[in-house]
A protein has these predicted regions:
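Carboxylate-rich, polar loop motifs that coordinate divalent cations or form catalytic acidic clusters
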Residues: 1-174
Length: 174
């Protein structure tokens, strides 16, 4: 298990110049938090966020995967109750979505949904079945309507939406 990354070198129809790497949880081989991967997304800064069985791994320089440099993923370190720990290290991350402000909406298998700052350090919102209309703490997917900021949470008990404040601005002003 793990994650396979393919570089088709700009010629997807010519496999003779392709290269690939298998990323695992070993140091020097990807450094994922876990080899069971549930979600992969690219944020607005080009960083790759990977949701696993045990938290989140971030590739800050994804081009380094094929350059031979140190390409291991990093974890987000946060302070909680005076302790330094990895962001959602004990959670199965089912989905990560990026809104128009580059914030991360994170779906977990047992703790509801989180909204964190663009760097992942600050928790902005935490929705659970106990503190919100969220139908279940098992959030299996999140989708964002970028034109109006509406966030859709798919749970094992149904879908509910939330009107967020971050949208993508597509109209050009001259």
């Amino acid at each position: 298990k793990g994650l396979m990354v393919l570089n088709h070198n700009g010629t997807p129809s010519d496999p003779s110049d392709d290269s690939y790497r298998v990323l695992t949880n070993e140091a020097g081989a990807g450094g994922l938090t876990n080899i069971d991967v549930y979600s992969i997304t690219e944020d607005l800064d080009g960083e790759i966020w990977v949701g696993t069985l045990q938290g989140i791994s971030v590739f800050y320089a994804p081009d380094a995967i094929f350059s031979g440099e140190n390409f291991d993923a990093q974890t987000i370190l946060i302070e909680q109750d005076g302790n330094i720990q990895e962001l959602l290290a004990t959670e199965q991350i089912n989905a990560i979505e990026i809104d128009g402000a580059n914030r991360k909406w994170i779906a977990t298998a047992s703790s509801g949904a989180y909204l964190v700052s663009p760097d992942g350090i600050d928790q902005i919102l935490h929705f659970t079945a106990e503190n919100s209309p969220l139908l279940s703490n098992n959030v299996v997917d999140i989708t964002i309507n970028h034109s109006n900021g509406e966030i859709f949470f798919a749970t094992d008990r149904g879908i509910i939406s939330y009107m967020s404040d971050a949208t993508n601005f597509d109209e050009e002003i001259s």
